[in-house]
């Protein structure tokens, strides 16, 4: 979201960030970057008054559930506003993969067609004028599996411009293994379980002096119970400085068995000059045709072997670090895609009616969804008054 805010500000847009969520001590100070914040309420006509008065040129929905809640109100009150959906990742892809892992069955893309979440998510994509997709693989899924018109999609990955290669620690200055990820995110919890039960015991047998450091916000009791100082498996909880944690580690381990989108931890490891060992799910959408900054292994025996090799062999480690820099420079620098995005926005603003006419299914869905959601929302609003 901060990346998008910066892009719009670069084009001269004033930004208003409206949210129904409660702020926490860890919320980003948007006012420090000249963003106006507004508290909004679910299922309330007060949003209609707010959006009418604001009369925005562009409305960006942060994930499809927000579009479900507020999209029809934007449609009714600001019909000429360009509606953009920031998908972050395809929730249906992540959840369908998760379900396959839990059932111990192979995942097939056709499984998505039976997903209720996919139906909601794709409906949201169709209702919006443009959907931002951060993974090339997900662009392919939307176009080939769901037959979404490419004109409704725009590839806009995470950007990583700051690589201070000369200021990074070298092989001998770094130590230990690290994993980092929010524990409210199920793929992260599953990955830590795999580390604890299947991967770390064997790595520790071969590298008894190494420690496995686990960082992540919102660790539940079941996560904290995995902490074992004797086994050198350390649960730290939230990292005060995530970049510092990754910079100091010799290797990042990410045995992701399911997920979607781009794994920020792996891109941040590249930026920090820290090689990684992950799975094909972890590397998805990141490496393209470039060599990984370490190893990609789905088989855990091979995963363990490559983690030990990377930890011990300086030449392989150095080459892996360089591979990560190459991936970031050639695939994730902002100047590779930010102007394309801004040009696309300007084009759509100038050709909005024609663009919408070419998306008849989207207009049909918007019409009927607006009616059904509207009356459900009004029923909730009236119920709350009682």
Residue ranges and their predicted role:
Residues 1-27:
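N-terminal subdomain of nucleotide-sugar transferases
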Residues 265-268, 275-279:
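Short hydrophobic beta-strand element within catalytic cores of glycosyltransferases
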């Amino acid at each position: 979201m901060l990346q998008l805010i910066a892009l719009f500000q670069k084009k001269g847009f004033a930004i208003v960030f409206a949210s129904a969520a409660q702020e926490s001590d860890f919320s980003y100070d948007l006012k420090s970057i000249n963003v106006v914040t507004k508290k909004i309420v679910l299922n309330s006509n007060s949003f209609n008054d707010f959006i009418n008065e604001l009369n925005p040129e562009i409305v960006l929905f942060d994930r499809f559930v927000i579009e479900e809640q507020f999209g029809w109100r934007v449609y009714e009150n600001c019909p000429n506003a360009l509606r953009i959906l920031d998908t972050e990742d395809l929730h249906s892809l992540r959840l369908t993969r998760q379900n396959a892992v839990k059932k111990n069955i192979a995942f097939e893309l056709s499984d998505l067609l039976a997903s209720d979440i996919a139906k909601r998510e794709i409906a949201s994509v169709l209702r919006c004028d443009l959907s931002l997709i951060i993974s090339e693989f997900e662009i392919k899924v939307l176009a080939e599996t769901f037959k979404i018109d490419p004109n409704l999609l725009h590839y806009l990955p995470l950007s990583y411009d700051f690589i201070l290669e000369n200021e990074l620690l070298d092989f001998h200055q770094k130590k230990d293994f690290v994993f980092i990820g929010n524990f409210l995110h199920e793929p992260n919890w599953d990955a830590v379980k795999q580390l604890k039960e299947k991967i770390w015991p064997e790595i520790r047998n071969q590298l008894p002096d190494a420690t496995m450091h686990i960082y992540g916000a919102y660790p539940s009791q079941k996560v904290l119970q995995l902490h074992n100082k004797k086994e050198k498996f350390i649960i730290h909880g939230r990292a005060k400085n995530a970049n510092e944690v990754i910079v100091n580690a010799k290797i990042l381990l990410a045995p992701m068995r399911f997920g979607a989108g781009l794994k920020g931890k792996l891109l941040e490891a590249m930026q920090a000059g820290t090689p990684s060992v992950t799975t094909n799910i972890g590397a998805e959408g990141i490496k393209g045709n470039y060599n990984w900054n370490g190893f990609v292994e789905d088989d855990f025996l091979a995963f363990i072997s490559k983690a030990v090799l990377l930890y011990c062999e300086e030449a392989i480690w150095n080459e892996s670090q360089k591979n990560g820099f190459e991936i970031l420079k050639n695939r994730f620098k902002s100047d590779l895609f930010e102007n394309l995005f801004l040009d696309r926005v300007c084009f759509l603003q100038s050709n909005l009616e024609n663009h919408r006419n070419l998306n008849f299914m989207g207009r049909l869905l918007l019409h009927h969804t607006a009616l059904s959601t509207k009356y459900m929302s009004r029923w909730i609003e009236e119920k709350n008054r009682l």
